[in-house]
Amino acid sequence: MSIFTPTNQIRLTNVAVVRMKRGGKRFEIACYKNKVVGWRSGVEKDLDEVLQTHSVFVNVSKGQVAKKEDLISAFGTDDQTEICKQILTKGEVQVSDKERHTQLEQMFRDIATIVADKCVNPETKRPYTVILIERAMKDIHYSVKPNKSTKQQALEVIKQLKEKMKIERAHMRLRFILPVNEGKKLKEKLKPLMKVVESEDYSQQLEIVCLIDPGCFREIDELIKKETKGRGSLEVLSLKDVEEGDEKFE
């Protein structure tokens, strides 16, 4: 769709329209396609990357800009950038059925890709293929939420799939290097957060190599910094502890 605005002679292309009704009137903003979801999920923070123009319209396709008095009446301000933010956050994205279907299909595939990348069969430590995760998502009738980020939805999918199949987040492999004095005491606090201790070395310092659930990383990092007052170190050896080859459904 190509739009010509007579007010500022800017030709708008590749437009996604976001609409809001307020005070009995319709207001629209012109955004770049595929950017609205990024803004709403917090991935995109630069407003200029989302908005084609900071103007508020009553009809984007006709280039009809909203009147100042209508903006003040509906929003209590004529600050168009602030109004654009409101519409962008709470308005309704206008897309065709075909576009919506394509977007949902792509999000479904993206969610499956994230799940396949982050998870394994806990018994074999092998990853599942994206195709198998997609099939499993269809089996549980997972419905994509267009206003939620794919990462958030991937976490939801993992929880739901756990009830139907053998799947869990792949473990991270870490190395801690801790001062000996605080090391033994700190190890006891770290124990509940470690899944598997692969090696321990007591020499001048305490060195531990272990596997953890990725969700515990921040807590472990903060605990080591706090208890050692910055003298301990934490190194990520691998983001995923997996075996070679893909897992197959039996």
Swiss-Prot record:
Localization (cell): Cytoplasm; Nucleus, Nucleolus; Nucleus, Nucleoplasm; Cytoplasm, Cytoskeleton, Spindle
One GO location term (cellular component): cytosol
Record note on disruption phenotype: Embryonic lethality. Embryos cease to develop prior to 6.5 dpc. Reduced assembly of 60S ribosomes and accumulation of halfmer ribosomes.
Protein name: Ribosome maturation protein SBDS
Residue numbers carrying Phosphoserine: 238
Major subcellular site: cytoplasm
Domain of life: Eukaryota
Cross-referenced Pfam families: SBDS_C (PF20268), SBDS_domain_II (PF09377), SBDS_N (PF01172)
Family the UniProt entry places it in: Belongs to the SDO1/SBDS family.
Lineage, broadest ranks: Eukaryota, Metazoa, Chordata, Craniata, Vertebrata
One GO-annotated biological process of the protein: rRNA processing
Annotated positions of the N-acetylserine modification: 2
Record keywords, A-Z: Acetylation, Cytoplasm, Cytoskeleton, Nucleus, Phosphoprotein, Ribosome biogenesis
Described function: Required for the assembly of mature ribosomes and ribosome biogenesis. Together with EFL1, triggers the GTP-dependent release of EIF6 from 60S pre-ribosomes in the cytoplasm, thereby activating ribosomes for translation competence by allowing 80S ribosome assembly and facilitating EIF6 recycling to the nucleus, where it is required for 60S rRNA processing and nuclear export. Required for normal levels of protein synthesis. May play a role in cellular stress resistance. May play a role in cellular response to DNA damage. May play a role in cell proliferation.
NCBIfam families xref list: RNA_SBDS
Quaternary structure (record): Associates with the 60S ribosomal subunit. Interacts with NPM1, RPA1 and PRKDC. May interact with NIP7. Found in a complex consisting of the 60S ribosomal subunit, SBDS and EFL1. Interacts with CLN3.
Molecular-function GO terms, alphabetical: microtubule binding; ribosome binding; rRNA binding
Free-text tissue specificity from the UniProt record: Detected in adult liver, brain, heart, spleen, pancreas, kidney, lung and testis (at protein level). Detected in heart, brain, lung, liver, kidney and testis.
UniProt organism field: Mus musculus (Mouse)
